[in-house]
Amino acid sequence: YRCHDWVMSNREEFLTWVRSILWDAEVAIHNGDARPRRAIWSCNDPVTVLGALKNASGQQELDELFAHLAESFSDCTSYEFDLLEAEVLGDAAYTVGFEHTSASVNGVPRTYTLRATQIYRREDDAWKVAHRHGSTPPE
């Protein structure tokens, strides 16, 4: 057993989760289904969103935000997450990257990019999102 091996396997396990379960949840919300995204978010406060459309703090505001997003989004034709950096530190992790999305927003087809930074906690052996900051990149 070497410490480096544990760190690499922990990071690879996290990245596999990001590229599968997290990715699926993002596609779902852009198709109008908030349930998969809500399932990957922590049910323990604090949880926060500094969003491109709206901010949220705490469970009630998070639920309201996700319901609003699900009502706004539909017809996702493309979602790509360009991961710039990710790190796992014990039971915490983060990702930084660009989200490239093509979906309808309030019925109008749009293609846009967001800068996204997310912080995760391991809870009951599962990764959960605790914070998200999404914003449009500078021109």
Residue ranges and their predicted role:
Residues 3-36, 46-139:
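A beta-strand edge to alpha-helix "cap/lid" segment located at domain peripheries
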